[in-house]
């Protein structure tokens, strides 16, 4: 059933609001946060913030409130693509209105028009926890063409300028005990390993967004299953799965990070899957939002570790003290 709720802003639930030039948007709220997704294009999740707080998602000012173009627009926010990237198929113009269905008090499904030239139907389910900042996103792709295709879901969050991406690394091993590799690092043709925006540390890989610099990107087979972004006094935390027996796109990547002068993207990917006609795949992300006030050196693992230690819990001794950093 496709329907709308009252535009009255609710303490907990779903309402419709105008936002940043778009007239038709869903607002999901609970006691802690609000999440806003536009129905005029996309779908795009445009805002995710504590009440009265900073929105870590980027919205491009020159594209805010626009719709109906015949070419693809980034616009910012969070979106669903499919991998591997293709200069035509990937950039299907998603500039038309989005249908929606309410599945629960703070649970909706967004469905754009089908990508007929690609033979795909995309959907994003958004479920806000009853309390706290947690959000569960289910990204779904269904094959509506006649012939099988192999692809992966690709969930991209366009983050606000001026922050730092944080990717945890596995514990250090020992030689000769640990003889086999435990991670992949994938580079793009425009990635310069001497770029000062990158910091490849003992505990973390860090990438700083810089308004004066051009594109750079890496991908990883990331088994730890979370990454995040520090900006504006908040830490945006994204969790995702790693399936060790699965094949992932881009030489085995389930996590990719891209930045340019305008923004930074945190991107999680699902396994490569062959879809026959009528078959679907799903890819789940879990979001959290935490206060992270204080100054820090973007190349100081110790300072960032101390900032994040109360926020992110991980099994084992991952958050053991980082000495000498």
PLM feature segments, named:
Residues 2-140, 144-325:
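Surface-exposed acidic/polar loop and edge beta-strand patches at domain peripheries
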């Amino acid at each position: 059933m496709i329907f709308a709720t009252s535009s009255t802003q609710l303490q907990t639930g779903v309402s419709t609001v105008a936002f940043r030039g778009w007239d038709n948007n869903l607002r999901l709220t609970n006691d802690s946060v609000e999440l806003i997704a536009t129905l005029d294009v996309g779908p795009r999740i445009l805002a995710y913030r504590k009440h009265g707080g900073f929105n870590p998602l980027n919205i491009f000012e020159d594209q805010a409130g626009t719709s109906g173009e015949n070419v693809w627009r980034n616009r910012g926010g969070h979106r669903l693509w499919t991998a591997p990237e293709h200069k035509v198929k990937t950039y299907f113009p998603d500039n038309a209105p989005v249908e929606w269905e309410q599945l629960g008090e703070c649970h909706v499904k967004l469905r754009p028009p089908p990508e007929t030239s690609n033979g795909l139907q995309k959907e994003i389910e958004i479920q806000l926890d009853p309390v706290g900042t947690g959000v569960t996103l289910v990204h779904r792709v269904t094959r509506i063409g006649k012939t099988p295709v192999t692809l992966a879901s690709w969930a991209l969050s366009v983050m606000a300028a001026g922050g730092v991406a944080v990717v945890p690394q596995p514990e250090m091993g020992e030689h000769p005990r640990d003889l086999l590799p435990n991670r992949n690092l994938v580079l793009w043709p425009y990635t310069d390993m001497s770029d000062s925006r990158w910091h490849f540390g003992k505990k973390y890989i860090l990438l700083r967004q810089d308004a004066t610099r051009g594109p750079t990107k890496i991908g990883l087979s990331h088994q730890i299953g979370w990454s995040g972004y520090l900006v504006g006094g908040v830490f945006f935390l994204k969790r995702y799965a790693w399936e060790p027996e699965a094949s992932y796109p881009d030489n085995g990547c389930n996590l990719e990070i891209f930045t340019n002068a305008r923004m930074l993207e945190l991107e999680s990917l699902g396994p490569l899957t062959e879809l026959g006609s009528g078959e679907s795949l799903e890819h789940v992300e879990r979001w959290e939002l935490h206060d992270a006030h204080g100054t820090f050196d973007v190349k100081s693992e110790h300072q960032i570790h101390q900032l994040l230690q109360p926020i992110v819990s991980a099994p084992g001794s991952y958050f053991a003290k980082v000495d000498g950093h």
